[in-house]
Amino acid sequence: MKLSLMAAISKNGVIGNGPDIPWSAKGEQLLFKAITYNQWLLVGRKTFESMGALPNRKYAVVTRSSFTSSDENVLVFPSIDEALNHLKTITDHVIVSGGGEIYKSLIDKVDTLHISTIDIEPEGDVYFPEIPSSFRPVFSQDFVSNINYSYQIWQKG
């Protein structure tokens, strides 16, 4: 099973402030919507609760709480390992989509990073882990918006 990771990261490494993303760069979320369309997303409970279930996506939500969901497109797991073990029986690709603890736990296990770097330095309390030296950028595109950003694809190896 291929594991990809998608994140929007500010210049100072912030990815969240409590349950919120501390910016709104017009157009950047369209990248997320396009890349994750019809895909399985692996997320933590807090991230899932802040983003909600987007249409045409399936979710594996990892939580230590008693969180449940009646949505047929949402599966809940008590650990990342249990989620991955189940997902590999039903799909060949999963996109790790946050939050901070999930990113930190899986960044060394993913094959591809989809990173939007947002040209802002907000306050926040959730940070993206350092990108391992085993990754190399293979694509980059800059976008001019209300808050400028760049989108990069990084591959392991």
Curated annotation (Swiss-Prot):
Q: Which UniProt keywords apply?
A: Antibiotic resistance, Methotrexate resistance, NADP, One-carbon metabolism, Oxidoreductase, Trimethoprim resistance
Q: What is its EC number?
A: 1.5.1.3
Q: Name one GO molecular function term.
A: dihydrofolate reductase activity
For the protein in the UniProt heading, the enzyme class is oxidoreductase
Pfam families hit by this protein? DHFR_1
What pathway or pathways are given for this protein in its record? Cofactor biosynthesis; tetrahydrofolate biosynthesis; 5,6,7,8-tetrahydrofolate from 7,8-dihydrofolate: step 1/1
Chemical reaction(s) catalysed: (6S)-5,6,7,8-tetrahydrofolate + NADP(+) = 7,8-dihydrofolate + NADPH + H(+)
Q: Please list the GO biological process terms of this entry.
A: dihydrofolate metabolic process; folic acid metabolic process; one-carbon metabolic process; response to antibiotic; response to methotrexate; tetrahydrofolate biosynthetic process
PROSITE patterns per the record?
A: DHFR_1, DHFR_2
Residues in DHFR domain copies: 2-156
What's this chain's function? Key enzyme in folate metabolism. Catalyzes an essential reaction for de novo glycine and purine synthesis, and for DNA precursor synthesis.
Sequence similarity: Belongs to the dihydrofolate reductase family.
PANTHER family in alphabetical order: DIHYDROFOLATE REDUCTASE
* Assembly notes: Homodimer.
Record's protein name? Dihydrofolate reductase type 15
Provide the species name: Escherichia coli
Q: What lineage is this protein's organism placed in? A: Bacteria, Pseudomonadati, Pseudomonadota, Gammaproteobacteria, Enterobacterales
